[in-house]
Swiss-Prot record:
One of its GO terms (molecular function) is transcription coactivator activity. GO terms for biological process: cilium assembly; glomerulus development; heart process; hippo signaling; kidney morphogenesis; mesenchymal cell differentiation; multicellular organism growth; negative regulation of canonical Wnt signaling pathway. Residues 222-400 are annotated as: Required for interaction with PALS1. Residues 52-117 are annotated as: Disordered. InterPro entries: WW_dom (IPR001202), WW_dom_sf (IPR036020), YAP1 (IPR051583). PANTHER family: WW DOMAIN-CONTAINING TRANSCRIPTION REGULATOR PROTEIN 1 (PTHR17616:SF6), YES-ASSOCIATED PROTEIN YAP1 FAMILY MEMBER (PTHR17616). Highly expressed in kidney, heart, placenta and lung. Expressed in the thyroid tissue. It comes from Homo sapiens (Human). One of its GO terms (cellular component) is plasma membrane. This is WW domain-containing transcription regulator protein 1. The gene is WWTR1. The PDZ-binding motif is essential for stimulated gene transcription. It localizes the protein into both punctate nuclear foci and plasma membrane-associated complexes. Binds to transcription factors via its WW domain.
Length: 400
């Protein structure tokens, strides 16, 4: 057999071999198509181990039937396939014993959700008309043949509850919830749907029958507290009124004392004003302060102790200009310098800073002479010249 005529070997699964020796254009297009649009291949054609296509023989190695809680015994497998419900978990096996017993009955899987603990009320007899029965799963419920109701709640617990007004509200809110769940899970136990809806009010009325007196006593407590609060408020109001009366009497007494002092010392009112201004703020009210100021302050009341004197240095009547005044200290120094007996003592007694003339003399127009170097005899004719120049009536003045 000619090796050249032998067929080419088959490519491995998942691969495609294209020969480009015959038609380059067509084969090159097929190469791009095979890359851009690969053909789906079967799982059987892929290189996979044989165990991938075989189902497990037993459930000992699977997650659905773990042996960590069944004591090494594989759990039973349902006919429909793998068991997805983990009924052999550790909590279930610890509570119900073995895994086989837990999976025997589907109804017993939820038996551990509601367990009845021991209670002292179990030893007490049921009230008249009540009967206790059990369901198929062992849960007990109570029948009231008088009112035709069915409930999960033990009527003996309501009788032994302490007489507390605050504990009745949680019982009201939590009673209808287990009854509705009972109606859904065990519909054959509900004798009448209408009586079931009325069960909560009727049961509460029967439970609250022996506890009518304590709420009445509790309702009277707010009234007693309110009365006590009213008495405290009255006492507090009386104390405030008495304190206000004492303050008013003290204010009147201070006003009388002040008026008496003002009558005794009318001429010294000006000297008392600063003292009163320092004493009045911490001890007297604003009303009293206004009265005090009006009666004793000479600058505000306009009384007989003070009159407005005529001002001689305000420049009234001088037109649009004003004559600068000579300070009193300066004139007193001039008088002392003119006296003959004090002429020898003047250089020693007068302070050099006090002999310095005021600054406004330097600002006068037309005076380019240092006024600080002039003597008193030279200043007198200078002031006369300035005054005569200011008193001229010419509208236009020429300063030299």
């Amino acid at each position: 057999m000619n090796p050249a005529s032998a067929p080419p070997p088959l490519p491995p699964p998942g691969q495609q071999v294209i020969h480009v020796t015959q038609d380059l254009d067509t084969d090159l297009e097929a190469l791009f198509n095979s890359v851009m649009n690969p053909k789906p291949s079967s799982w059987r054609k892929k290189i996979l181990p044989e165990s991938f296509f075989k189902e497990p023989d037993s459930g000992s190695h699977s997650r659905q039937s773990s042996t960590d809680s069944s004591g090494g015994h594989p759990g039973p497998r349902l006919a429909g396939g793998a068991q997805h419900v983990r009924s052999h978990s550790s909590p279930a096996s610890l509570q119900l014993g073995t895994g086989a017993g837990a999976a025997g009955s589907p109804a017993q899987q939820h038996a551990h959700l509601r367990q009845q603990s021991y209670d002292v009320t179990d030893e007490l007899p049921l009230p008249p008309g009540w009967e206790m029965t059990f369901t198929a799963t062992g849960q007990r419920y109570f029948l009231n043949h008088i009112e035709k109701i069915t409930t999960w709640q033990d009527p003996r617990k309501a009788m032994n509850q302490p007489l507390n007004h605050m504990n009745l509200h949680p019982a009201v809110s939590s009673t209808p919830v287990p009854q509705r769940s009972m109606a859904v899970s065990q519909p054959n136990l509900v004798m009448n749907h209408q009586h079931q809806q009325q069960m909560a009010p009727s049961t509460l009325s029967q439970q609250n029958h022996p506890t009518q007196n304590p709420p009445a006593g509790l309702m009277s407590m707010p009234n007693a507290l309110t009365t006590q609060q009213q008495q405290q408020q009255k006492l507090r109001l009386q104390r405030i009124q008495m304190e206000r009366e004492r303050i008013r009497m003290r204010q009147e007494e201070l006003m009388r004392q002040e008026a008496a002092l003002c009558r005794q010392l009318p001429m010294e009112a000006e000297t008392l004003a600063p003292v009163q201004a320092a004493v009045n703020p911490p001890t007297m009210t604003p009303d009293m302060r206004s009265i005090t100021n009006n009666s004793s302050d000479p600058f505000l009341n306009g009384g007989p102790y003070h009159s407005r004197e005529q001002s001689t240095d305000s420049g009234l009547g001088l037109g649009c200009y004003s004559v600068p005044t000579t300070p009193e200290d300066f004139l007193s120094n001039v008088d002392e310098m003119d006296t003959g007996e004090n002429a020898g003592q003047t250089p020693m007694n007068i302070n050099p800073q006090q002999t310095r003339f005021p600054d406004f003399l330097d600002c006068l127009p037309g005076t380019n002479v240092d006024l600080g170097t002039l003597e008193s005899e030279d200043l007198i004719p200078l002031f006369n010249d300035v005054e005569s120049a200011l008193n001229k009536s010419e509208p236009f003045l020429t300063w030299l």
